[in-house]
């Protein structure tokens, strides 16, 4: 098991009250695979440094989790398939 930090930028048109439940739906991949979600920090709507898909803002969320590399890759893949997710970045903070 490795520690990961996942940053997710969601479409700003998503209702901010539904961000946490939709993240839980994705994070269930980690929980069912034997990993753990250590912390979920929703930053809210922020201005982007540059436009992504003609959007100037996004809803930021940072998730700290512990999982196997395969589970982390599967989570990143599923997030990439969702249209409400503008961008994701998955890193290992202990490796940098």
Curated annotation (Swiss-Prot):
Keywords of this entry: Ribonucleoprotein, Ribosomal protein, RNA-binding, rRNA-binding
Keyword Metal-binding assigned: no
GO cellular component, one term: ribonucleoprotein complex
Molecular-function GO terms, alphabetical: small ribosomal subunit rRNA binding; structural constituent of ribosome
This protein's record includes keyword 4Fe-4S: no
CDD domains named in the record: bS6
GO terms under biological process: translation
HAMAP family registered for this protein in UniProt: Ribosomal_bS6 (MF_00360)
UniProt record similarity statement: Belongs to the bacterial ribosomal protein bS6 family.
Function: Binds together with bS18 to 16S ribosomal RNA.
Listed name of the protein: Small ribosomal subunit protein bS6
Organism encoding this protein: Beutenbergia cavernae (strain ATCC BAA-8 / DSM 12333 / CCUG 43141 / JCM 11478 / NBRC 16432 / NCIMB 13614 / HKI 0122)
Gene that specifies this protein: rpsF
């Amino acid at each position: 098991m490795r520690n990961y930090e996942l940053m997710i930028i969601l479409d700003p048109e998503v209702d901010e009250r539904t961000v946490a439940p939709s993240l839980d739906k994705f994070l269930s991949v980690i929980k069912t695979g034997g990993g753990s979600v250590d912390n979920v920090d929703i930053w809210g709507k922020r201005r982007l440094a540059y436009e992504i898909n003609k959007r100037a803002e996004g809803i930021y969320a940072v998730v700290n989790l512990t999982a196997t590399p395969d589970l982390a890759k599967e989570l990143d893949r599923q997030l990439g398939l969702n249209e409400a997710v503008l961008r994701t970045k998955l890193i290992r903070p202990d490796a940098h």
